[in-house]
């Protein structure tokens, strides 16, 4: 009986995670820009501390980070409008 309860709870949790749409890029560190006069690319990032999307930039020479979105709409679509 107890095993059935654990199986049911696991299945319920799995369905909830799948339905919510887990987005790992939203859990990555936010964009915080570059030092000095380095080339920067500007866009949008999800800020976990504030729980919302904000403008940010990254240093082009390091490559595009995972928590970068071209528009506020893309950011909100992936990470939610918290």
Curated annotation (Swiss-Prot):
InterPro entries: Kunitz_BPTI_sf
One GO MF term attached to the UniProt entry: serine-type endopeptidase inhibitor activity
Annotated signal peptide: 1-21
Motif residue range(s): Cell attachment site: 35-37
Alphabetical list of SUPFAM superfamilies matching this protein: BPTI-like
Subcellular location: Cytoplasmic vesicle, Secretory vesicle; Secreted
Disulfide linkage: 26-79, 34-59, 53-75
Keywords per UniProt: Cell adhesion impairing toxin, Cytoplasmic vesicle, Disulfide bond, Hemostasis impairing toxin, Platelet aggregation inhibiting toxin, Secreted, Signal, Toxin
GO cellular component entries: extracellular region; transport vesicle
Primary subcellular site in the record, as a coarse category: cytoplasm
Tissue: Expressed in salivary glands.
Function recorded in the entry: Tick salivary platelet aggregation inhibitor that plays an important part in the anti-hemostatic strategy of ticks. Inhibits platelet aggregation induced by ADP (IC(50)=130 nM), collagen, the thrombin receptor-activating peptide, and epinephrine, although platelets are activated and their shape changed. Binding to platelets is similar for resting and activated platelets (Kd=50-70 nM). Acts by specifically binding to platelet membrane glycoprotein IIb-IIIa (ITGA2B/ITGB3) in a divalent metal ion dependent manner.
Name of this protein: Savignygrin (+)
The organism of origin for this protein: Ornithodoros kalahariensis (Tick)
